[in-house]
């Protein structure tokens, strides 16, 4: 399939009415959430993928808002028809985080109690607060299962938090260039950036919205952070020790080197699109992020149910491969389904935004390698062997079933009854279940590819397969609708 753009898109808004409880104990009223969607939600609402943005990102992840836009959304290379997050197949959703400044309630928003911007009176938030707000949006859309949650950097933290806070909702998760526990070094860089903002006289205790914003402090904070997004190799390649002007030093305090001019440009342009107070709150949320429990990351991740893909960047020194491997170790201890990939790149941390070829390849392979467990229905109505046909018919009618597995007292599969079997029993005046049920039942295993199960169903002209574990205990069922929805 050729890769195309999602085209012209619009930002949508949802208001969470009433008071919203935050992890720190405070509440916020009537939170407004900015979000964008790409692709179509299927009838079963089972194809949704939530994309979580990084520290200074926003909801505009793909497409353009108008034909005049110079740049598309920040992950346009990954989201769209034929791309890893294929909008011909998935319903992709991205929202601006709580505390942000791109449409979602944050420090620059009006406090309904005062009619003025919150400023520094905005309550301190956490990654979990961000995720809880996203959950309310998912609920509003009627989505009860996320096919995947995907995010890089701070977006990876949100992805992990989703898997921990709402394990039953997330089928798959992709964590890119991130960590499960913010390190002292990462906290230190954030602290220096916050101090640069707070030290700017124009910050004015966070109350600057009717005056001059603290552009110098915010620009410096961005310059500091941007260094951590690059690698030594990429800076050597891009700038080396090349001078900004001429071939000799100026021997004054002006900027001599190209790398300095580049950082200043990054800082200055950043002040035109981001709020200084939002930067304070977002970095604080990152500092607080720690999914370990009693010092053990394995304990903190023990309830994760999603199939996980953890991706690191070889040259990333902000969230180095070490941090990704610690996530994998924490998941492996409890035997969670996790795979790990390293992206070879000299771009540093920003490679998750720049290495679109590798990122597309790895994510596409992970999302499309669908197993039976990814799509099976886990809550299956059953009937015990020895039950009457009348009982079976009643269960099938009340649950609107065409297939009813028969199990023994240990939950092991011993047969299956279909709606055709019930019709046959009525015609032949049978009363015993064992006279009509199929005993030699074709089954599937949870870890086998869905394609293999689909071929088995087609070969035998059946429309459902019970899913069993290694001891033949029933753990789920898949039917032709599940197959058609996924592989057409």
Swiss-Prot record:
It is found in: Cytoplasm. Residues 376-433, 437-488 form the CBS domain. GO terms for cellular component: cytoplasm. PANTHER family: HOMOSERINE O-ACETYLTRANSFERASE (PTHR32268:SF11). Belongs to the AB hydrolase superfamily. MetX family. Substrate binds at residues 222, 350. The keyword Ubl conjugation does not apply. Transfers an acetyl group from acetyl-CoA to L-homoserine, forming acetyl-L-homoserine. It catalyses: L-homoserine + acetyl-CoA = O-acetyl-L-homoserine + CoA. This is Homoserine O-acetyltransferase. Homodimer. Its main location: cytoplasm. Pathway: Amino-acid biosynthesis; L-methionine biosynthesis via de novo pathway; O-acetyl-L-homoserine from L-homoserine: step 1/1. Keywords: Acyltransferase, Amino-acid biosynthesis, CBS domain, Cytoplasm, Methionine biosynthesis, Repeat, Transferase. It is an enzyme of class 2 (transferase). One of its GO terms (molecular function) is homoserine O-acetyltransferase activity. It holds the Pfam family Abhydrolase_1.
């Amino acid at each position: 399939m050729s890769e195309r753009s999602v085209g012209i898109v619009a930002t949508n808004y949802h208001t969470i009415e009433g008071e919203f409880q935050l992890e720190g104990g405070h509440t916020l009223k009537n939170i407004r959430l900015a979000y964008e969607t790409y692709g179509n939600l299927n009838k079963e609402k089972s194809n949704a993928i939530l994309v979580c943005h990084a520290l200074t990102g926003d909801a505009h992840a793909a497409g353009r808002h108008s034909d005049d836009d110079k740049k598309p959304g920040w992950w346009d290379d990954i989201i769209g028809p034929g791309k890893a997050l294929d909008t011909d197949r998935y319903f992709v959703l991205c929202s601006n985080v709580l505390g942000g400044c791109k449409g979602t309630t944050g420090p620059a928003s009006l406090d309904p109690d005062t009619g003025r911007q919150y400023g520094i009176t905005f309550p301190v938030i956490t990654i979990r607060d961000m995720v809880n707000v996203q959950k309310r949006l998912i609920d509003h859309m009627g989505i009860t299962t996320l096919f995947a949650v995907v995010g890089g950097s701070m977006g990876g933290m949100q992805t992990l938090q989703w898997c921990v806070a709402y394990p039953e909702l997330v089928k798959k998760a992709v964590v890119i260039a991130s960590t499960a526990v913010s390190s002292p070094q990462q906290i230190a860089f954030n602290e220096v950036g916050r101090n640069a903002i707070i030290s700017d006289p124009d910050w004015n205790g966070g109350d600057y919205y009717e005056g001059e914003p603290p552009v110098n402090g915010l620009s410096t904070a961005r310059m500091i952070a941007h260094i951590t997004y690059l690698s030594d190799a990429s800076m050597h390649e891009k700038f080396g020790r090349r001078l900004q002007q001429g071939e000799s030093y100026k021997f004054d305090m002006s900027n001599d080197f190209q790398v300095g001019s580049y950082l200043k440009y990054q800082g200055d342009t950043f002040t035109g699109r981001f709020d200084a107070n939002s930067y304070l709150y977002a970095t604080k949320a990152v500092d607080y992020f720690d999914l370990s429990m009693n010092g053990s990351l394995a304990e903190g991740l023990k309830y994760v149910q999603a199939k996980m893909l953890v991706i690191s960047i070889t040259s990333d020194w902000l969230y180095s491969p070490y941090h990704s491997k610690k996530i994998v170790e924490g998941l492996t201890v409890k035997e969670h389904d996790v795979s790990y990939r390293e992206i070879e790149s000299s771009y540093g941390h920003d490679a998750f935004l720049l290495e679109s070829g590798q990122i597309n390849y790895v994510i596409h392979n992970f999302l499309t390698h669908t197993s039976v467990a990814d799509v099976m229905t886990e809550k299956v109505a059953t009937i015990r062997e020895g039950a009457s046909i009348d009982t079976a018919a009643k269960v099938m009618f009340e649950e609107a079933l065409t297939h009813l597995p028969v199990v023994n007292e240990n939950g092991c599969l011993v047969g299956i009854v279909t709606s055709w079997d019930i019709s046959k029993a009525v015609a032949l005046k049978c009363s015993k279940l064992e006279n009509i049920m199929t005993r030699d039942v074709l089954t599937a295993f949870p870890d086998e590819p869905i394609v293999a199960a689909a071929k088995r169903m087609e070969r035998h002209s059946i429309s459902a397969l019970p899913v069993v574990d290694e001891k033949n205990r029933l753990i789920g069922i898949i039917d032709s609708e599940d197959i058609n929805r996924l592989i057409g």
